[in-house]
A protein has these predicted regions:
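A substrate-engagement module of RecA-like helicase motors
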Residues: 184, 191, 243-352, 360, ...
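Walker A/P-loop
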Residues: 212-234
Length: 791
C-alpha cells in the first residue's frame, strides 16, 4: 500500500499516556492527580504564568508526531503549555493548576511528566535537537505559589521511552484500523431498514447534508415520523464517507436511550458492523449498595487498572451493542469496576449512547473527549433537544448554602483549626450577604468570598488527601466538590450569568451563580466535533432553541410534516375554563371535573389528564371521588410525588387496550408521564391538558424574564410562555403514536384561543374546535361517530 493512502488514526497525547501508563488500584480518595487537576488545562493560571515567562516563552504550542505502521499511521497530537527554545537548550513546560498545598507535592505526578516527555520528544524530533529539559510547573490556584520540577532528558532516552509507550498501544491501533475497514464496508452497503414514511427521507437527506457541510441542524419532527432512525441512518452514512469517526447519541431520559439501542440493533440486523456502548450512571452499575471506589471498600477497585485492559480488549472483539447488562457481565468476569470499564470501552467503539451530562457537564463530561485542547471528528445527535435548555442552565450553574459551612465546621471543629478559620471567614461573608437580602438579591461581584473559598478548597484537598479514613469523609468530599464547582463556575462568568442570593422557604440561605443562557457553554463542547443535530417533537419556536442551544440564528432548520391522517385526531379548545391563579377556585375545579366526565363518557378507553400542579390534581381528584357519574364512567389513578421506577411501571401497566372499563390517569404536566411515554395501538385515546403549562413565578423565572427584557427580547415569552407551551405539546404528544391510533387532544384553557398561543401551535394542529361545557359532548360524539364510519 502506498504511504499516501494509509489510513490515519488519531490519538491525543493525554489519552495515550493515561491509557498506557495506568496500573494498580482505582482509588477516588485521592483528590490530586491528572483527573483532578484544577480547572483543567488552559485556565486562568496557565495564561497568567505564560504571560510572566518572557519573550523566549512560546505558549500553547501544537505538537504532532506520526508513527508509521505497515497498514496505517498513528497521528499523536497535543498542545505543550510552553516551549523555551534557546541556543543553550530546549525546555518543555507543562503547567498544572492545583488546589493542594505544594508542600505535599514532592515529585511530579507521573502522567503529567509523561505528557511533557511526549512533547519533548516531538519537538526534538522535528527540530533535530539532542535533548530537552522537561519542566513541570505546579501552581496553587489560591496562593499562586509555584513549584517546578526539572529533569534533563537526552533525545535517545526520550525516543526509547516513547517507542516503548507506543509499543503498548499498537495492538489497540491495529484493532481500530481493521475494525474501521470492516465498519466502512458495511456502511457502504447499508440501506434504510424500512420503506420510508412521508417526510422521513427528506429528514435523512437534511441530516446528511448538514454533516457534509459541517453545520448544525435543528429538526422539528412530530411523533411517528421515526426521528431516531431518520437521524441515525444518515449519521452512520456520513461516518462511512469519512465525515466523522465517533457518533454521540445524547439523551435526557433512560427510555430514549433504549430506543437508540433498539435502532442500532435494527441496523445491525441489516448488515451494519458498528459497535456502541451505553454509558450508565455509576450508581446503576456499581456492585456495591453505595459506590465506594477504593481498594479497601471494593474488591473490584483493587488492581482494577491491571485487569481492565484485558476486559476492554475482549468485550470490543466479542460484543456489538454493549449495554448495561453486558458491562456487568464482563466486569464480574474480569473483577473490574463496571463504571470505569464502561468509560474505557467508549474509546474503542463507533457510537456512544449517553446522557447529556457526559458531553456537557464540566464536572461529569468525558474528559478524554472534551477537555481543554482535545477535539475530534465527532458527530452529535441530541435527542429530545428541548430538554437541553433547562439541563444546560443546571449544568453550568453553581449553588452553595450558608448552612453547609456551619455543618462542616461542626464536623472539623476539634480536628483542623486552619479549615475552621477559613469556614468562619466564608460564613461571615455569607452572613453579611444574608443581612442585605430580603427575599432575593442580585449581586455584581463576590470576589472576596471566592478568594476565601479558593483557600478553603486548597485546605480541604490537603485534609482529604491525608485523612482517607475520616468518619465523615463523604460529607466533606461532597462539600469540597460543591465549592470546587462554584470556583470553576465563577471563572466562567460572563454576560450570560446572573449572581443572586435568596432566602429559601426551608430557612436556608442560598448563593447561586445562575447561567441564564447556556448557548456559549454548550457551543464550547459542540465545537469540539464536526456537526450537531438537535431534534425533538417540540422544538418550537425554533428561533428560541437556536438562541439558547447554539447562539446562532442562522443554523439550518427543518420542519418535518406529520405522517398521520389528521382525520384520526380531534383537537378541542375550551373557551369557558382557565387555570389562571385568579381562577383557581372550587367552581373552576368542578368545571374541569365535568369536562373529564363528559369527554370520557363519549368513548370507552384510556385517557391521560395533565394538571398544572399536585395541589390542582388533588382538588380535581377530591371532586371525582364523590361524583357518582364519574364512578360509573371510569376508574382513575393519580400520579404521586417521588414515584420510584417500579411504581411508575405499575402505573403504566394500567393502560391496557383490553380493559373492561375506561381508565383515567391524573398526572402533573411536566412530570415523569408528560414525555417519553409510548402508549400506542389503542392503549391511549385521549390527552386532556388543563392550563398553559406556565412555570410558577419564582426567583429563577423572574431573573430569566429580566435578563431577556434587558436584551430587548420578550422576557415573558422566553421565561414563561415558550417553556409552558413546550410542556403542553409534550403532553399532547402522548396521543397517536402510530398510523393505527386515533384519539382526542383537549386543551382546557381559554388562553389557547389567543393568537400568541396559536402562533406556537405545531402545523399539524391546524383546525381545532372551540367548545364550552354545554357543547363539548356534541363535538366529541360527531368525531367518534365519524371514526366508527371510517373503520
Amino acid at each position: 500500500m502506498d504511504v499516501e493512502e494509509k489510513k490515519i488514526l488519531k490519538m491525543s497525547v493525554r489519552n495515550l499516556v493515561e491509557f498506557v501508563l495506568r496500573s494498580g488500584d482505582l482509588d477516588n480518595r485521592r483528590t490530586s492527580g491528572a483527573e483532578k487537576t484544577a480547572m483543567q488545562e488552559g485556565s486562568r493560571i496557565h495564561r497568567k504564568i505564560q504571560r510572566r515567562m518572557g519573550a523566549d516563552y512560546k505558549a500553547e504550542v501544537v505538537l504532532k508526531h506520526i508513527v508509521e505502521e505497515d497498514q496505517f499511521k498513528i497521528l499523536i497530537e497535543g498542545r505543550a503549555d510552553g516551549v523555551i527554545d534557546k541556543p543553550e537548550g530546549l525546555t518543555i513546560d507543562e503547567i498544572k493548576g492545583i488546589y493542594m498545598d505544594l508542600d505535599y507535592l514532592t515529585e511530579p505526578i507521573p502522567v503529567h511528566l509523561a505528557q511533557a516527555m511526549c512533547y519533548g520528544y516531538f519537538y526534538c524530533y522535528d527540530h533535530h535537537l539532542n535533548g530537552a529539559v522537561i519542566q513541570l510547573t505546579y501552581c496553587n490556584i489560591e496562593t499562586e505559589e509555584i513549584r517546578r520540577f526539572q529533569v534533563e532528558k537526552p533525545f535517545e532516552e526520550l525516543e526509547l521511552w516513547f517507542q516503548g509507550l507506543v509499543h503498548e498501544y499498537i495492538k489497540w491501533a491495529r484493532y481500530l484500523y481493521n475494525h474501521g475497514i470492516r465498519r466502512d464496508e458495511s456502511i457502504w452497503d447499508l440501506e434504510f431498514p424500512y420503506p420510508y414514511r412521508a417526510g422521513q427521507k427528506d429528514l435523512a437527506v437534511a441530516v446528511f447534508r448538514s454533516m457534509k457541510r459541517k453545520r448544525n441542524l435543528f429538526i422539528q419532527a412530530p411523533t411517528g415520523i421515526g426521528k431516531t432512525l431518520s437521524t441515525l441512518y444518515p449519521s452512520i452514512k456520513a461516518m462511512g464517507e469519512g465525515l466523522g469517526d465517533k457518533l454521540f447519541y445524547l439523551t435526557a431520559k433512560t427510555i430514549t436511550r433504549s430506543v437508540a439501542e433498539e435502532s442500532f440493533d435494527i441496523l445491525r440486523e441489516k448488515g451494519l458492523y458498528f459497535n456502541t456502548v451505553t454509558i450508565t450512571a455509576k450508581e446503576k452499575l456499581c456492585f456495591l449498595d453505595t459506590p465506594e471506589c477504593n481498594p479497601d471498600a471494593c474488591p473490584y477497585a483493587k488492581g482494577h487498572f491491571d485487569r481492565v485492559g484485558d476486559a476492554v480488549y475482549e468485550i470490543i472483539h466479542k460484543e456489538a451493542g454493549i449495554t448495561r447488562e453486558v458491562i456487568l457481565t464482563y466486569a464480574r468476569e474480569f473483577q473490574v469496576c463496571p463504571f470505569e470499564l464502561c468509560l474505557d470501552i467508549s474509546n474503542w467503539v463507533d457510537g456512544v449512547i449517553c446522557d447529556y451530562n457526559y458531553v456537557f457537564d464540566p464536572n461529569i463530561r468525558l474528559k478524554r473527549y472534551f477537555s481543554e485542547g482535545i477535539s475530534g471528528e465527532y458527530l452529535f445527535l441530541v435527542d429530545e433537544a428541548h430538554n437541553l435548555v433547562s439541563r444546560g442552565r443546571e449544568m453550568y450553574s453553581a449553588i452553595v448554602y450558608k448552612e453547609d459551612f456551619l455543618l462542616i465546621k461542626k464536623l472539623l471543629k476539634s480536628v483542623d483549626g486552619k479549615i475552621v478559620k477559613l469556614l468562619d471567614r466564608c460564613n461571615k461573608e455569607l452572613l453579611r450577604m444574608k443581612r442585605e437580602c430580603e427575599n432575593y438579591r442580585l449581586l455584581e461581584d463576590i470576589r472576596f468570598l471566592i478568594t476565601s473559598i479558593m483557600s478553603l478548597v486548597g485546605e480541604l484537598e490537603r485534609f482529604l488527601e491525608v485523612n482517607r479514613d475520616f468518619a465523615d469523609r463523604d460529607l466533606i468530599l461532597l462539600f469540597y466538590f460543591t465549592l470546587r464547582n462554584l470556583v470553576y463556575t465563577y471563572e466562567r462568568l460572563d454576560e450570560n450569568y446572573r449572581i443572586y442570593t435568596e432566602n429559601q422557604s426551608d430557612g436556608r440561605f442560598m448563593l447561586r451563580l445562575f447561567c441564564v443562557n447556556p448557548a456559549n457553554n454548550l457551543k464550547e463542547c459542540l465545537n469540539k466535533g464536526n456537526s450537531t443535530v438537535f431534534f425533538s417533537a417540540t422544538l418550537l419556536p425554533v428561533s428560541y432553541y437556536k438562541e439558547l442551544l447554539s447562539g446562532d440564528l442562522d443554523e439550518y432548520a427543518v420542519y418535518a410534516p406529520s405522517p398521520f391522517d389528521q382525520k384520526k385526531r380531534l383537537l378541542i379548545v375550551a373557551s369557558d375554563v382557565s387555570s389562571r391563579y385568579t381562577r383557581r377556585n372550587q367552581r373552576e375545579y368542578e368545571k374541569i371535573a365535568s369536562y373529564l366526565i363528559k369527554i370520557v363518557s363519549k368513548r370507552k378507553g384510556n385517557y391521560m389528564v395533565f394538571l398544572p400542579s399536585y395541589h390542582y390534581l388533588k382538588e380535581v381528584e377530591s371532586i371525582l371521588s364523590v361524583n357518582r357519574t364519574a364512578k360509573e364512567t371510569f376508574t382513575y389513578l393519580s400520579q404521586n410525588t417521588h414515584m420510584n421506577e417500579q411504581e411508575r411501571e405499575a402505573f403504566l401497566m394500567e393502560f391496557s387496550e383490553h380493559r373492561e372499563d375506561s381508565f383515567v390517569a391524573l398526572c402533573v404536566m411536566g412530570g415523569v408521564f408528560s414525555e417519553g411515554i409510548d402508549l400506542k395501538e389503542g392503549r391511549l385515546i385521549g390527552a386532556v391538558i388543563v392550563g398553559t403549562g406556565l412555570p410558577m413565578v419564582c426567583t429563577e423565572q423572574v431573573i430569566l424574564k429580566g435578563y431577556f427584557d434587558e436584551k430587548g427580547q420578550k422576557g415573558f415569552d422566553y421565561a414563561y410562555q415558550y417553556p409552558g407551551m413546550n410542556k403542553v405539546m409534550q403532553a399532547a404528544g402522548r396521543v397517536i403514536r402510530t398510523d393505527r391510533d386515533e384519539g382526542i387532544i383537549a386543551l382546557l384553557d381559554e388562553r389557547f384561543l389567543k393568537l400568541d398561543y396559536q402562533a406556537l401551535f405545531p402545523r399539524e394542529w391546524d383546525g381545532f374546535y372551540e367548545v364550552k361545557l354545554n357543547t363539548v359532548e356534541n363535538v366529541l360524539e360527531d368525531f367518534w361517530k365519524n371514526r366508527r364510519k371510517g373503520e
